[in-house]
Amino acid sequence: TTTVRFESATVPMARLAALFRTLESNHLTPELTDAVAEVWVRLSATRTEMLLGVDLFHRIEQVPFTDLNPEDKPHQELTVENFVRAGVRLGEEDRAHMATIEAELTALSTSFSRALGTDTRELAVHLGEADELKGLSEDQIAAAATRAGERDESGYLLGLNNFTQQLVLGPLESAATREHVLRNSMARGARGGDGDTRAQVSDITALRALQAKLLGYPSYSSYAIDNQTAGGPDAAADIVSSLIAPANAQLAAELD
C-alpha cells in the first residue's frame, strides 16, 4: 500500500516533467526560458526532498519482497535502489550536502540548456542560393526559406538539431554546404559569450564527482553505470572496444 500510494503521488510530477521536457526540446523560446527554469528547480527540489526522506524510505524498505509477485518484486527493488542512489542512507549532514549538490546541478543543467539553445539559434546556417541546398526535398527547402523569412532575412536558413551529426548532411549534395553545417554544429558551446557552455560542463563534472564520492564510488562513471548491464566503466569500455574491429571491417568492405 505504501509503495502504491508513493507511486500515485509521483504521477503528476512525472507528467509535468515529461511535458516540460518536450517543451524545452522542441518549442522553447526566450520568453519561456525563465518559466521553464523555475519549473525544473521546483521539480528537482520536490524529487530530492522525497528521495532523501528517511521516514518514507523506512516505510518502503519494510515491504517484504517475498510477498510480491514476479512483476511487483523488481519494481519494488528499483524503488528502493532509487532512494539509496539518491543518498537516503547517508548521515544527516551528507544528505543535506547531496540536496545542495542536486539543486546546483539542476541550476547548471538549466543554464547549459539555455546557453546551448542560444548558440544553436545563432549558428543556424544562412545560405543565399537554392543551389546550395541541392539534395534536400522541396518541403525542406521551403521550410528553410520560411525560417529565414521569420528572421527577416533573405535566402534560406538551416536550423541545427540538438545533436552534433546533422540530419541534412546525408541528402545535401554540396560539400561546401555540408562543411558549413557541420562546422557550425561542432562550434556550439565553445565560442565565448552567452552561448558558451564550457563553464557549466566543468562545474557539472566537479559536482558529479563529489556526488559519487559521497556515495562511496571512485568516480561518477562508476556510479552512473553501477546499476547497468555492464556493471562498471572498464567493462563498458571493453564492450565498445570489441566493436572497433568489426566496424572497421564493415567500413572497408563498403568502401571497396
Model-derived features with residue positions:
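Zn2+-dependent metallopeptidase catalytic domains
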Residues: T1-D256
